[in-house]
Amino acid sequence: MAGTIEVLVPGGKANPGPPLGPELGPTPVDVQDVVNDINDQTAAFDGMEVPVTVEYDDDGSFSIEVGVPPTAALIKDEVGFDTGSGEPQENFVADMSIEQLKKVAEQKSSDLLSYDLKNASKEVAGTCASLGVTIEGEDARTFKQRIDGGDFDDYFDDE
């Protein structure tokens, strides 16, 4: 590959303007082709900032690798709020179901250090705690302890 460009773009809404256009302008690739390809691949992340890596060759060919948005962005999108709590241990901004927790863990699993869905869900629960999001009406830290205690083993065993 002749070069690599890493940018953060709005899911499904990349355009030839900044930050993508100025980076791709001096390269041999067709900017609009890259933009269209990125939009196709990031459509599922509509409304979220998505990390994208574009690798290109001198002949104008390119490949795109789409990353997963930050865990906090996935949680905010899934539960439907804009800003986390300024006092996450006292003021809660939203409540997440265990199904939503599992969905975010599945979306993020390729970027997490966990080997299974149960542990990935615990990592997501940790982010919920820092955002001020409860899980099934409980403080996320308490819910995480219940996962550790095996209360939801049957739920996470259907992997």
Swiss-Prot record:
GO terms for cellular component: large ribosomal subunit. Residues 1-26 are annotated as: Disordered. The keyword Ribosomal protein applies. GO terms for biological process: translation. Keywords: Ribonucleoprotein, Ribosomal protein, RNA-binding, rRNA-binding. SMART domains: RL11. Forms part of the ribosomal stalk which helps the ribosome interact with GTP-bound translation factors. Belongs to the universal ribosomal protein uL11 family. This is Large ribosomal subunit protein uL11. It comes from Haloferax volcanii (strain ATCC 29605 / DSM 3757 / JCM 8879 / NBRC 14742 / NCIMB 2012 / VKM B-1768 / DS2) (Halobacterium volcanii).
